Design a protein with these regions (language model features):
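Nucleotide-sugar-dependent
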Residues: 12-18, 196, 249-257, 263-283, ...
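Membrane-proximal helix-turn-helix segments that form the acceptor-binding/catalytic region
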Residues: 25, 66-73, 93-97, 104, ...
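Donor nucleotide-sugar binding/catalytic pocket of nucleotide-sugar-dependent glycosyltransferases
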Residues: 54, 127-175, 242
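Conserved donor-binding/catalytic core segment of Leloir-type glycosyltransferases
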Residues: 6-8, 145, 179-205, 215-216
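Glycosyltransferase donor-sugar binding loop
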Residues: 39-42, 214-228, 245-246
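Conserved acidic donor-binding segment of nucleotide-sugar-dependent glycosyltransferases
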Residues: 307-319, 326-333
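A charged, aromatic-enriched C-terminal amphipathic alpha-helix characteristic of glycosyltransferases
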Residues: 317, 321, 333-363
């Protein structure tokens, strides 16, 4: 039987795009047995992309630790691939107990996570403390995997670090948006909240032609849905907006391909993770052939949008700048040209296969 790689999550959903549909699927396709152990209703769920799914029910994230620990030890994996800092702790402890390999997946810039909760004078000290704690955990791991460029700087001296970025995963048979004349439908795909720019999104929509629509596919992650609805109503926009909620990936992409004309990425400045962001929604839109309106301050996003020529970079703090970009994309030929560039880039330089190859090379070196 092939060695078991355990994908360990303390917070990610059972069919998470990066953990399961990208990383796990790539490992399973290469012949490894892969299981995702994560929060959920409890028990086994149907496999996703060749990855076994096992969930543990708990009333809180902290209450999940002990069941996770017991189950990891019972499964006796050859490698534990952990996706959050609290899961990292479990992974390195369990790996030492079992003689397994521990791989820590660094999804974001964790030292800045407390910035929004602290007064500005305390933030540098908090970053130093968090960075020191994370380095201490990482020092006990066999390898670090980084979801975007720039994260390795927090772990100087670790001998085995690999970038496996969230580049475009293009499912077979993915529909492609056909661009034609008519009113535009703007798309926000994925998690949404105040810091992801919905106030600016609504203000920009109010500056667009009256038949311009907004389609939101995803969850509010900051509890602001009621405020969103109230602001939309205050601006007289409620009839132009559809909140479709969360959808499985296949359904979300099919809906976007059928209806959306422009992909919006409007997260706001002020957070290090926004500056370094490399969101799945960028690549999903590219894979569908949608032009994107994106923030110019987000360095990886700006590099891709400029390099691929697949959209417009704007000051996302200014609704007028967003609305002006929407007006530029009212021309179907312009949308089609930018969308075509993104469609090709998602299947070429910015596609997932190159990232998957680095992940597979790492695991082949670790497990032989």
């Amino acid at each position: 039987m092939p060695p078991l790689i355990l994908l360990l999550s303390a917070a990610h959903p059972p069919d998470d795009m990066r953990v399961v549909r990208k990383e796990g699927a790539a490992l399973a396709a290469a012949g490894f047995r892969v299981l995702h152990l994560c929060p959920g209703p409890g028990g086994r769920l149907p496999p996703v992309a060749g990855v076994e799914i096992e969930t543990l029910a708990a009333p809180s994230r902290r209450a999940l630790w002990r069941p996770l620990w017991r189950r990891v030890l019972a499964l006796r994996p050859a490698a534990i691939h952990a996706s959050e800092p609290d899961a990292w702790v479990l992974a390195v402890r369990a790996a030492r107990r079992l003689g397994a390999r521990a791989v820590l997946d660094v999804h974001e810039h964790y030292p800045s996570r407390l910035d929004a909760r602290l007064p500005a004078p305390l933030r540098p000290l908090a970053r130093l403390a968090l960075r020191a704690a994370l380095r201490a955990i990482a020092a006990r791991a066999d390898a670090l995997v980084h979801a975007k460029s720039g994260l390795a700087a927090d772990f100087p001296g670790h001998p085995r670090q690999v970038e496996v970025r969230n580049h475009a995963l293009v499912p077979e048979g993915l529909p492609r948006r056909a661009h034609g004349p008519g009113p535009l439908t703007l798309l926000h795909l994925g998690a949404i909240g105040v810091k992801r720019g919905w106030p600016q999104m609504l203000a920009a929509l109010s500056l667009c032609p009256a038949k311009t629509r907004l389609l939101v596919i995803g969850r509010f992650t900051d509890g602001s849905e009621a405020a969103f609805r109230a602001e939309a109503a205050r601006r007289g926009l409620a009839g132009r907006i559809e909140l479709a909620g969360w959808m499985p990936a296949e359904a979300a992409l099919a809906r976007a391909a059928a209806e959306a004309d422009v992909n919006l990425i409007l997260f706001q400045p002020g957070e290090e993770n926004h500056r370094l962001a490399l969101p799945h929604k960028l690549f999903d839109g590219m894979a569908l052939g949608l032009p994107v309106i994106a923030p110019g301050f987000a360095l990886p996003v700006a590099e891709i949008v400029q390099g691929a020529g697949c959209g417009l970079l704007v000051d996302v703090t200014r609704p007028a700048a967003i609305a002006a970009a929407v007006a530029e994309l009212a021309d179907p030929a312009r949308r089609a040209a930018l969308g075509e560039a993104g469609w090709r880039a998602a299947r070429g330089e910015w596609g997932w296969p190159g990232e998957a190859a680095r992940l597979l090379a790492l695991y082949r070196a670790l497990l032989g």
